[in-house]
Amino acid sequence: MELIRNFKYSGGFFGHYEELIRDVVIPYQERILNDEIDGIEKSHSLENYRLAAEKIETGKCSGKFYGMVFQDSDVAKWLEGAAYSLCLNPDKSLEERCDSVIDLIGRAQEADGYLDTYYTVLCPEKKWTNLEQGHEMYCAGHMIEAAVAYAESTGKEKLLHIMCGMADHIYKRF
C-alpha cells in the first residue's frame, strides 16, 4: 500500500481512471451486489451472505442461494477495489459501508472457520468435494486479497482475522 499511497498524480490518464473507478464503478458495483439496479439480472451476492448468516445463527434459511458457485468472489473484488480507493481517497461513508459488509461476512462464517455461502446455504454436504470446479479456494483467495488490502488501507483487521480463520480451516482440512 505504501506504493499506492506514495503515487501522486493530478488528472491525466491515471487521474481519469481513478476518478471513474471511485465515482462510478465502485458505487455501481455496490448497487449491483445489493440488487438495487432494475432491468438486469440480480446478483444476490450480499443476500447469499445474509442467508448464510441466518443459517449459522438460526439453523434455517428463509430464502435460497442464487447465483454461481463463485458468487462470493464478487463481494471480495468489490471490497478490494474499495480498499484501494480508500487508500487514495479516504471516504468515511464508503468505509462504513465496507465495515457493514465485513460484519455480515463474519456472521456468515462457520464456527470452524469455513466461509463460502454456496456450500453453507445450498449443499453443506458437498464442501471440499470438487476442488477443481467447486471454487472454494478461488473465493477464499479473492477474499484474502481483499482482507489484506482493507487492513493495509484502513488499519482495520476484522476481515483479515475472518480470513485467517478460513486459512486455518483449509490448513486443518488438507
Regions found by a protein language model. Name each.
Residues 1-174:
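Glycan-recognition and catalytic cores of secretory/periplasmic carbohydrate-active enzymes
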